[in-house]
Amino acid sequence: MIEQFLNNLILASSSERRIALLKQINIEPGLILPADIDEIPLRKELPKDYSIRMAKSKAEKIQSSNPDYFVLGIDTVVACGRRILLKAKNIEQAEKYIRLLSGRRHRVYTSVCLLTPDRSKQHIRTVVTIVKFKRLSEREIKYYLASEEWKNRAGGCNMQGLAGMFVLFLRGSYSSIIGLPLHETYCLLSNYFNLNLY
């Protein structure tokens, strides 16, 4: 297999967290292009299926106008049981999410989709991480909501910020819950790219 260079890779996301995580393992995509797609879950769609569909849809949307590139699409979903917790639209919804997660285990699904040029191959990996929050006091809930860290976060949770202090334990991948499973992403990309590890 001929090794590609990273300027042939597009990241279908403008997430600063994901860009920083990729840089952590010395990966800098040639282009960063966010994908504007419909993120409404399908009726009775399960969280894992939704995460896979979103990652794939983001990659496909960007590759449709950039067919000669590899495209990396990523999606992170917070789920309580079968309920998908999307990005909170307002503080009222963020409060509902935080109260729902308080004292309970929940799952974070992060799917990574790599499309090769012209969609000749498609690789998808999904990482599931179990997280348990402490039971939150009213003061903690109000403090977190006032911080506005819930904005633009799946389930209203910013694990790199204040929400991190609510975590009693997690089982799985920490990098995955903040937006990108590093091990799985590295393994996918190393099949095609010269990652300059030496």
Swiss-Prot record:
Protein name (database record): dTTP/UTP pyrophosphatase
Bilayer-crossing regions: none
InterPro entries: ITPase-like_fam (IPR029001), Maf-like (IPR003697)
Active site residues of this protein: D75 (proton acceptor)
Molecular-function GO term, any one: UTP diphosphatase activity
A biological process from GO: nucleotide metabolic process
Catalytic activity of the protein: dTTP + H2O = dTMP + diphosphate + H(+); UTP + H2O = UMP + diphosphate + H(+)
